[in-house]
């Protein structure tokens, strides 16, 4: 898949989950909030992460060259934040973070399609560059 459709799918799923968590965890009209994150919520978040990860991979490594820009960096940071949150949700209760993080992730998922100003990276074959990039 190419174009804006994969970005829209991932962003829509993040936005839906953010709205859902806001209604069930933060809203004053919500009934008693469920304890912890439910299985379907965790699965939907995993699906959003996979869609967003696929979009990022295509943005960064599509066409056989590596491209990186400001919008891709923001998208990558929010993907990593949601991934860390998702993994940590298996071990600790982190309610209250979803309504904050997921709308930002939805917005940042769309950024690479709206602002595609990326430049080609020259030293991608260098092992030192690869180490630096993956550590950063």
Residue ranges of predicted features:
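Membrane-interface helix-loop junction between the first two transmembrane segments
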Residues: 18-41
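Hydrophobic transmembrane alpha-helical segments in integral membrane proteins
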Residues: 1-16
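Cytoplasmic-side transmembrane-helix entry/capping segments in multi-pass membrane proteins
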Residues: 35-45, 71-72, 94-106
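Hydrophobic alpha-helical segments and helix pairs
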Residues: 92-136
